[in-house]
Amino acid sequence: MNGRTRSPARAVMVLGTTSGAGKSWLATALCRWYARQGLKVAPFKAQNMSNNARVVPGSGGRLGEIGSAQYFQALAARVLPDVRMNPVLLKPENDTGSQVVVLGEVRADLAAVPWRERSERLWPFAQDALLALMAENDVVVIEGAGSPAEINLHASDYVNMRTAQAARAACLLVSDIDRGGAFAHLYGTHQLLPAAERALLRGYVLNRFRGDARLLEPGPQQLLALTGVPTLAVLPMWRGHGLPEEDGLHDEGPGWQRGAGNAAASLRIAVVAYPRISNLDEFQPLRQLRGVQLRWARSAEELAGADWIVLPGSKHTSGDLAWLREQRIDAALARHAAARRPVLGLCGGLQMLGEALVDPHGVEGENGEGNAPGLGLLPLVTAFEPDKLLRRTDACFDGVGDEWSMLRGVQFGGYEIRHGRSVQHPALPAAAVALRNAEGEAIGWQQGSVLGLYAHGLFESTEVLRALFGARVRGLESVFDGLADFIDRHFEPGALMRLLADAEPGKD
């Protein structure tokens, strides 16, 4: 389609019978598969709920946030990510409330609006972004959210079938057969959709199947007879695809997750999994490293045996710090640091490692909830500011030593998403400035074996991985091509191009 006047785009949408069915990675695979056919492709998800976010170009030359899944999908599609690909991002802050990000920018005025009213106010932003992407591309690969057939939410659900209808999309419905009940999930979802929405379903996908696919017979044929929709693919269980799962933390057990290494020779890295953990996807490369074992630790006991302890990002630093103390993880961290064993804090984790959190503007809650003593492992004071700092960061390690000396001189590109601003405590001996950005600003500090950084993306840098572990991981291009090869093998021959033919062209 490239090289001539572009006809209206066609859309392929990935729906799921449940959360965690495999929508995100399949949408990513489709982005690369269609891009390899010479088509101009863009991803889209009307609304994402996640604390995994990336910094991308927004409107007016400003930077904004989108969900990490759409960021990776854009890279798979070989296009520059932008805020229209995920026009609404909800970042949970507590059990009942979320920060609302619209076209990359925080909209505080929408946070307290009731859900149904807010959905109607957000839909025009999502629709405009979708239509703009369809006007600029040959194919738009759309990811749904949860299930499209939640009958109590259906009237206000703009992320699934309302988006599908606006795009005139050919829809795939994915079910996780490893959980059991896949045929019932597919049939029930089909039956609960109104007739006009059912008509958009073009194929079923059975994901994460173990064993001989012939054991499924005659299920797909009976499902076709009942619904008129064919099963286009049975995808085998595949844990090694290399992409982070959007809800991957919740799928992990409490034990050490071993990559390619020998258990006895492995470096054990424990990541503290507090309730409002954010940007956990940046740890995905560690799962691929030979000789590294990863664990999500939710208690002091689960830190036992760790060589490194990592405090990741947090969407609510003071709240997660209180939780950390309730679990007695603070004492375990102090012992670990006193033994000169590596402790790493990233963004919110860095803030926790300091002397104090100060919240004069109530960013983390009213009535002083955001004010708290820190862990005292770095001589820093962090103040939370109302304006969120978003930026892409080119940084260089310069003042690192001791346990982190192997990073000296290493450069990497990361990103920052934060309300906190940290400075050295004036009454305490200064920590070494460990990391500076291209402007020379300090964005990382070290004291003894404790290192705190504001830049996310550390473990996504091949230079950093080589310095820390003497290792390389598969590059993203290899991961994306592997995904495309996988679906090419397991979808019915010609099915993916037929989906485009079945999709109605978008409006000019």
From Swiss-Prot:
For this protein, the record's InterPro entries field holds: Class_I_gatase-like, CobQ/CobB/MinD/ParA_Nub-bd_dom, CobQ_GATase1, CobQ_N, CobQ_synth, GATase_3, P-loop_NTPase
Which residue numbers delimit the GATase cobBQ-type domain? Answer: 266-464
Q: Which Pfam families match?
A: CbiA (PF01656), GATase_3 (PF07685)
| SUPFAM superfamilies xref list | Class I glutamine amidotransferase-like, P-loop containing nucleoside triphosphate hydrolases
Residues forming the catalytic site = C347 (nucleophile), H456
* Protein's pathway: Cofactor biosynthesis; adenosylcobalamin biosynthesis
What are the entry keywords? Cobalamin biosynthesis, Glutamine amidotransferase
Biological process (GO) annotations held by this record are: cobalamin biosynthetic process
A molecular function GO annotation: catalytic activity
Instruction: Write out the similarity annotation.
Output: Belongs to the CobB/CobQ family. CobQ subfamily.
PANTHER family under this entry? COBYRIC ACID SYNTHASE, DETHIOBIOTIN SYNTHETASE
**Function recorded in the entry:** Catalyzes amidations at positions B, D, E, and G on adenosylcobyrinic A,C-diamide. NH(2) groups are provided by glutamine, and one molecule of ATP is hydrogenolyzed for each amidation.
Q: What is this protein called?
A: Cobyric acid synthase
Question: Origin organism of this chain?
Answer: Methylibium petroleiphilum (strain ATCC BAA-1232 / LMG 22953 / PM1)
- Gene this protein is translated from: cobQ
